[in-house]
Amino acid sequence: MLRICGLGVVLSLAVAAVAVMAVWLMDWWGPRPGIRLFLPEELARYRGGPGDPGLYLALLGRVYDVSSGRRHYEPGAHYSGFAGRDASRAFVTGDYSEAGLVDDINGLSSSEILTLHNWLSFYEKNYVFVGRLVGRFYRKDGLPTSELTQVEAMVTKGMEANEQEQREKQKFPPCNSEWSSAKGSRLWCSQKSGGVHRDWIGVPRKLYKPGAKEPHCVCVRTTGPPSDQQDNPRHSNHGDLDNPNLEEYTGCPPLATTCSFPL
């Protein structure tokens, strides 16, 4: 019962996180009266140099005063290229050239967009929000453009994917592994393997995921009902061993918690 409740708590927290983030997105990107709007040429004056009015940068169209982190963004500093502009793409690509320091995020994946959103959370927490940048993400009236609406949808999609990944990790925690030139490789399961604390150990199995080139080792519960049939009283008491996406390791006993493969 503790195991089932624990998984339920994890999933409930994940769902709650998505709901809370939806509220944050509305607050960040929705209408806000009296907000300051910057034109690109105006923001370009805020590079932190002598005589400049300040040190600002923009991310996904939101402008932040980064004066408190001046040593990172002032002229000559490592991240000086971000100052006075929206260089959203470079937060993901790491391309700090003039060609890379742009706000064009076309072609980025949902996970990369989610990384941008995580950066946005960082700036929201550590720096002062001062306005919005008119252009790719905000219109002249300060409201989101269709491109920013697409970003919001991708953030939601990325969060849902993370939620699914967390659910999968609770069901099939990654194995512990080690390799040495003297002993070869070893895979094993414990109650903490994969960073997932639980009341069962499990046995190593290959898990094949759709689209993945290679399987990876996961720990599989060997008793009780399948994870997707917790309320079925007529289960075979094999845990998740009968999952069709799993395969035993050749040369390893089916119920061994450790599989060793000498050289």
UniProtKB/Swiss-Prot annotation:
Gene Ontology terms: cellular component: extracellular region
Keyword Secreted among record annotations: yes
Subcellular location: Secreted
Keyword Secreted carried by entry: yes
Biological process, per Gene Ontology: neuron differentiation; positive regulation of neuron differentiation
SUPFAM superfamilies for the chain: Cytochrome b5-like heme/steroid binding domain (SSF55856)
First and last residue of the signal peptide: 1-22
Tissue/organ expression: Expressed in various tissues including brain, heart, adrenal gland, and kidney. In the brain, mainly expressed in pyramidal cells around the CA3 region of Ammon horn in hippocampus. Present in brain (at protein level).
Ranges for region Disordered: 220-249
Basic and acidic residues: bias regions: 231-241
Molecular function as annotated in GO: heme binding
Alphabetical UniProt keywords: Neurogenesis, Secreted, Signal
Record domain Cytochrome b5 heme-binding: where: 35-134
Assigned protein family: Belongs to the cytochrome b5 family. MAPR subfamily.
Function of the protein: Heme-binding protein which promotes neuronal but not astrocyte differentiation.
Domain notes: The cytochrome b5 heme-binding domain was proven to bind heme, although it lacks the conserved iron-binding His residues at position 73 and 106.
Other noteworthy facts: Non-classical progesterone receptors involved in extranuclear signaling are classified in 2 groups: the class II progestin and adipoQ receptor (PAQR) family (also called mPRs) (PAQR5, PAQR6, PAQR7, PAQR8 and PAQR9) and the b5-like heme/steroid-binding protein family (also called MAPRs) (PGRMC1, PGRMC2, NENF and CYB5D2).
Name of protein: Neuferricin
Organism field: Mus musculus
Originating gene: Cyb5d2
